[in-house]
Each structure stands twice: as structure tokens, then as C-alpha cells.
Amino acid sequence: NYLTEVEIKIDIYDFRADFKKENYHNHPNVRQLYYAIPTDLYLKHKDEIDERIDNAGLILIDELMDYNGIIYGKVNGFHKKAKPRKNAVPLTEDDKFHYLKLGCMKWVNR
């Protein structure tokens, strides 16, 4: 009955910019926050990333190429589990409908 937010970051500049946001991932319905980043990005900037993510979790993604040259990501694993926020507000039925609608709008408008 809660949301889990996953922020996808593909480079260190995008990752750093996330911490300059005025409202840093503090929506009341979000119980856990994860960053999903390429494994090689993490290995290159491990100390900085570990220091900044605080209670957020970390999902590492490996970049793979298939036989046709198509690049895709494969989850390497949960490097760190997110600490649940104690003040998170459970979703109401209206909230669930709202988020489902938002998700559908993102696909329909492509």
C-alpha cells in the first residue's frame, strides 16, 4: 500500500544533479527510494555514491549487448536495500487510481 520510487541515473552528473532538487524525493506516499545505476558508474564513483545515498537503496545494472548489437540493461542485483520511511502515508484507493492513470498516460502519449 505504499510507493517505491526508483530513480534511474546513467551518469555521475545526472546523479549529482538529483541532490540539488528543491524537493528531494519526499513525496508522502513513497516508502522506499532506490537509485538504479550502471555497475561501472558505481565502481568508478563508489565512495561519493555511498556517501550521498543515505537511506536510499542501490540497484546495480549491467549493460549487455545481444548478437544483433542491441544494448540493454540487466539487473545485477540490489547492492543496498532501502531503509523504509517511517512517516510514509499508505495509498488510498483514489491514490492508486491516480498513479495508474499517470503510468498509462506516459505510455499513451509516446
Place the predicted regions along the sequence by residue.
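Active-site beta-strand-loop-beta-strand hairpin of nuclease catalytic cores
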Residues: 1-5
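Anionic group-transfer/hydrolysis microenvironments
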Residues: 7-9
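Short, charged, amphipathic alpha-helix that recurs within catalytic cores of restriction-modification
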Residues: 11-52
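Non-catalytic C-terminal interaction segments of nucleic acid-processing enzymes
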Residues: 47-110
